[in-house]
């Protein structure tokens, strides 16, 4: 960052079904840590991480929104002022991909098109993986950024947030 250049701040929301790993992904990204203990997010939890993109630096304000499998109960008001979002699905539970797809439709209807990345989390559990490559390929063909991730090992986490940081700071 050059002297006198203002620090960019961008609000990023974490969205996905119940128990897909949103909080663990944030913890991995912000603290480079993972905990086996499961804690349910109530409402929203906010964290911050500074990302150096070379030509600029951005503070990502991460809003970890409580996961719901019934998307009608997800509070879209949390997304006000959001520059982009991370959709999270659990690769061992295909129904959570359906929740993520529905959440994206709802976000677009309520807030317009925003940059996003879809993380298929729990990639370390390959023997239990249940989302087919055809579904993933179809989403990529539709222009989606789809990445495998593991909050436990850190696989794909940093790259996904960095990609989103680049996209939300790009000139519109």
Which residues are covered by each model-predicted region?
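TRAFAC-class small GTPase G-domain
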Residues: 1-172
């Amino acid at each position: 960052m050059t002297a006198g250049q203002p620090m960019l701040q961008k609000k990023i929301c974490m969205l996905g079904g119940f128990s897909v790993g949103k909080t663990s992904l944030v913890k991995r990204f912000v603290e480079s840590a993972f905990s086996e203990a499961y804690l349910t997010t109530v409402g929203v939890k906010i964290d911050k991480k500074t990302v150096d993109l070379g030509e600029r630096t951005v503070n990502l304000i991460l809003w970890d929104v409580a996961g719901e499998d019934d998307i009608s109960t997800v509070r879209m008001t949390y997304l006000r002022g959001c520059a982009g979002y991370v959709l999270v699905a659990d690769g061992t539970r295909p129904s959570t991909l359906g929740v993520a797809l529905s959440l994206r439709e709802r976000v677009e209807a309520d807030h317009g098109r925003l940059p996003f990345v879809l993380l298929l989390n729990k990639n370390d559990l390959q023997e239990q993986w249940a989302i087919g490559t055809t579904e993933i390929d179809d989403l990529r063909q539709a222009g989606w950024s789809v990445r495998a991730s593991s909050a436990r090992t850190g696989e794909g986490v940093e790259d996904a947030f960095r990609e989103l940081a680049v996209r939300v700071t790009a000139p519109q």
